[in-house]
Each structure stands twice: as C-alpha cells, then as structure tokens.
Amino acid sequence: MSVSSGATYDVDATDTIQSLSGAGNIELASGITLTTGDGGNDTLSGVISGAGNIVKAGSGTLTLSGTNTYTGTTTISGGTISIAADNGLGAVPGSATAGHLTLNGGALQSTADFTLNSNRGIALGVSNGTINVDRSTTLT
C-alpha cells in the first residue's frame, strides 16, 4: 500500500498488508495491529500515530523515516525495520514497558547516531532477533 502525501490511511481494524510506503500518514485505532511484510524494500516518510501496534513480518526492509507518535508496540517478526531516530518507533512510553519493542525473528537497523530509549523495554521472542548498527554510527 502506498499512502500519498497529504493522505491518511485510517486503520480502524486489525489488518495485514503486503507493503507500506509513501509520504502520507497512518492513523492506528486503539488496540488494533497493522501487519506489513513482503520481500521488497519500502520507505514510509509520513507519520504513524494513534494507539495501535505495528508488526513487520516477511522479508525485506521497511524504513520508517517519519517522526512517529503511535503509542502501541512494535514487533519485528521478519525482515528489518530501519530507523534513523528513536521516534521512528513511535512515542516513548512514560515508564519502562516490557515488550514495547519485540524482536522475534527480524532485525532493527539503526542508520544514524541516536539513543534508543530504555523505556521501550526490548524483548526477544522465541525466534530471537538482531539489532544492526550501520558502520560509522553509534546506537546507545
């Protein structure tokens, strides 16, 4: 799915899509999960907001370059989510939240110097996962 600049994809029920790209925004309703995954490499530069959850499944890389504000969880079950800032993963929880970011067979890729907030409560699922840091950058 490609979301055009100026458009908003309102996700009001749990949904699975093959791809996610574009400069438009995503609004996640409370408690729902948006799962995306395919073998391609996609970039979403719009803002993901709301109280829902994101799951990256399948192979390929999903680059989240917007200043995201969603408050739900992020699970990487396959492929890679690539970010250049902590807010690529949405709003930081007000206190440590176990499993706010779950690696379960996929990878988180950092592409710039930044600090991943400890309140995200990184968890490893049964399939484990990895955190990859681009050469010449620092993730703390």
PLM-predicted stretches and their roles:
Residues 1-42, 49-63, 71-139:
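Beta-strand repeat architectures
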